């Protein structure tokens, strides 16, 4: 029974470090993809928002890009309050202050 002693100091530190590095790379890759996804969504919504078309002062309603639809010279629908981008709070539409 004395031969059944376990020595816990023989753990390979290189394999432990390698596992930690792999987990760190995977988490970092996921975070980077998420950030790039949000940036791509912002630019896609910004490109689709056109509210001054050939001199017409019309505010075109576009879902998901209300903060970018309100240009400086757009006076058709004045808005008050804090402008919260809809991609931060997808379930709440707090950026519109005018009732339907």
UniProtKB/Swiss-Prot annotation:
For this entry, list what GO says about its biological process. proton transmembrane transport
Per the record, the major location class is: virion
This protein is called Glycoprotein NB
Give membrane topology per the record. Answer: Single-pass type III membrane protein
The stretch of residues making up the signal peptide is: none
Organism name: Influenza B virus (strain B/USSR/100/1983)
Q: Does the keyword Iron apply?
A: no
| Lineage per the UniProt record | Viruses, Riboviria, Orthornavirae, Negarnaviricota, Polyploviricotina
Its subcellular locations are: Virion membrane
A Pfam family (short name) is NB
Q: Which GO terms describe its molecular function?
A: channel activity
């Amino acid at each position: 029974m004395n031969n059944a002693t376990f020595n816990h100091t023989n753990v390979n530190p290189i394999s432990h470090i390698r596992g930690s590095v792999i987990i760190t790379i995977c988490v970092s890759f996921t975070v980077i993809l998420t950030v790039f996804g949000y940036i791509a969504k912002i630019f896609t919504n910004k490109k689709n928002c056109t509210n001054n078309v050939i001199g017409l002062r019309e505010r075109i309603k576009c879902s998901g890009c209300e903060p970018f639809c309100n240009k400086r010279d757009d006076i058709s629908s004045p808005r008050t309050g804090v402008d919260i981008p809809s991609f931060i709070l997808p379930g709440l539409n707090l950026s519109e202050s005018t009732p339907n």
